[in-house]
């Protein structure tokens, strides 16, 4: 299985994804991710704009999914913006 950490950016079928699963969980062939898109309608706090590799991309939080690790290729990290990602997941789950 590919080594991925929380807030890593990985490519999956041509789409950039942020891994949001805790590293404290036991290894699994699947991992929870959220797509990073450049043309997604942003809702305040739910869809923060993140910078990756000189691009400004929207975290499409409602499109949260699980994908097979084997299909992911790590291309970077947004760990420095991890608070925005965590807040977005909190808003998705709790509404606040």
Locate predicted features.
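C-terminal terminal-subdomain/extension
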Residues: 52-96
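Compact nucleic-acid interaction/catalytic patches
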Residues: 3-49
